[in-house]
Design a protein with these regions (language model features):
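Glycan-recognition and catalytic cores of secretory/periplasmic carbohydrate-active enzymes
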Residues: 1-260
Length: 260
């Protein structure tokens, strides 16, 4: 409970709130250029940052302002993103990167916003995101549930972004109780642990991609980039969530291995 650190966090959140534009957006993209690249990915972390900060925030007024801001942020997204038949942009088309996998990961803070507010429109938006399957070319949630394919064999294999999508699916299960999604998350986690987690607790020996790292980690050819720190930290966060969900010690062991 470092008072200086807490003040720095409060000041940072206050500063973030001033970045909101007249549409309720907190984005580094202008309106004409939004929904490209890493726009939604960054907006995800704006909302997640506020949500995690609220867990330690002692200022009730600041917490209320965070919730109000997040509602405006998400309401704007709901007005723009959705099925084509409604004249909206599909979530998996809101980035030209990784078939929309990065944009789909905004699922996590959307579900958490529903948990905070109880407003069904946020759960409905989360349900839409889940229905799109994470990418424009395959439904990664179905692949995980069917449990016939290792994640490094999926059509899109970006490690960090994929784990982030499954963190969102886990939150969606908690909100809905739909058993299919619980099993999809657990099966995905177990396959990652078996096929892609290395001896040092990370993954992705080909740049930042899942690539059967459990086997490829012994390859003597070095490509220059491997086992991204972002992948490691996200795997740790995912392991913690899986441990809370299942009580299975293997996820605690993998968390500790990555930490050390």
């Amino acid at each position: 409970r470092d008072e200086k650190l807490y003040k720095a966090l409060c000041d940072t959140v206050e500063d973030m709130l001033t970045a909101e534009d007249e549409f309720g957006r907190i984005s580094s993209f202008t309106v004409p250029t939004e929904f490209h690249g890493w726009d939604l990915w960054c907006r995800k972390y704006v909302m997640l940052g506020m949500q995690y900060f609220m867990e330690i925030c002692e200022d009730e007024d600041l917490k209320k302002r965070c919730v109000a801001s997040m509602c405006r942020q998400c309401d704007y997204l709901i007005s723009k993103l959705g099925p084509k038949r409604e004249g909206k942009l599909p979530i998996t088309s809101a980035s030209e990167c990784w078939r929309g996998l990065n944009s789909s990961s905004i699922l996590e803070p959307v579900v958490r916003l529903y948990d905070l507010t109880g407003d069904k429109k946020y759960l409905d938006f989360a349900s839409y995101i889940v229905s799109e399957g994470g990418t424009s070319i395959c439904n990664i949630f179905d692949l995980a549930y069917e449990d016939k394919t290792d994640p490094y064999q999926y059509p899109v294999t970006k490690a960090y972004e994929m784990m982030s999508c499954f963190e969102g699916l886990l939150e969606y299960y908690r909100a809905t109780g739909i058993e299919r999604y619980k099993q999809a998350v657990i099966r995905f986690g177990r396959r990652i642990l078996k096929t892609d987690i290395t001896i040092i607790g990370s993954a992705g020996c080909t740049h930042e991609l899942l690539d059967h790292s459990a086997a490829r980690q012994t390859d003597t050819a070095y490509a220059g980039i491997m086992q991204e720190t972002c992948v490691t930290v996200t795997w740790m966060k995912f392991c913690w969530q899986l441990l809370m969900l299942t009580g299975e010690v293997e996820f605690a062991d993998s968390f500790e291995r990555a930490l050390y």
